[in-house]
Amino acid sequence: MQQGDLYDHESLVKAIKQVDVVISTVGHGQLGDQGKIVAAIKEAGNVKRFFPSEFGNDVDRTHAVEPAATAYATKAQLRRTIEAEGIPYTYVSSNFFAGYFLPTLAQAGATAPPREKVVILGDGTAKAVFNKEDDIGTYTIKAVEDPRTLNKILYIRPPSNTLSFNDLVTLWEKKIGKTLEKNYVPEEEVLKNIQEAPIPVNVILSIGHSVFVKGDQTNFDIEPSFGVEASELYPDVKFTTVDEYLNQFV
């Protein structure tokens, strides 16, 4: 275990000199400070791959409004810095963490999936991607020494985990054997709610708008020039499907 302080350049360089790969998992508050990691990697000169703290939407292909837009812009700016410095990288676009959204079907303030009513942002047709956190970790480690992921975006977008909100609700209804009352929230109302909501509700809503209304996780094709898809690269990995994941809540 190598120790280094994000805010102590010398200690960071010393730690990074002992490794070949740097995977950053800093939280929201430190996203902008990853430039310090880039500077240390540049000075150390030995790192073969850097994975910045991404693990969400592809920040170069988003239609997010504030306040999510600022967080995405911070990540995008770091990408440009990494590229300008010539540091070998992989950006992991893992889309949604299943554990954050599926236990409640993304219902605000809920502690369990809905049994009577469900709120759906937009018309429910935009497709989103839900991946179990363990599987995201597995795919990330697989990518570490894979030349196919070098200087590429690794999208974790298995077809069986790519569902519209309507698909998700239908799947859940089949499992519990009943039909839910559906409340569709039009985009104009979603945007109004974002502007009026306090932190962190406005952040969550703006991410929901980006994904469930604008379809930012799936409204583009993965082109070989910039990206690869994890379940295609590693068909041997047995990942948890959304269908399987929801069984624990029935």
Task: Mark where each language-model region is.
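Oxidoreductase cofactor-interface core, primarily capturing Rossmann-like NAD(P)-dependent enzymes
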Residues: 1, 7-15, 28-32, 44-48, ...
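Non-catalytic, hydrophobic alpha-helical segments
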Residues: 22, 136, 168, 242-245
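Amphipathic terminal alpha-helices
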Residues: 227-250
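A short glycine-rich beta-strand->turn/loop micro-motif centered on a GG-aromatic cluster
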Residues: 53-55
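Glycosyltransferases and closely related glycan-assembly transferases
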Residues: 37-45
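N-terminal Rossmann-like NAD(P) cofactor-binding module of classical short-chain dehydrogenase/reductase
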Residues: 16-25, 51
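Extended, non-catalytic subsegments within catalytic or DNA/protein-binding/adaptor domains
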Residues: 69, 132-133, 225-228, 239
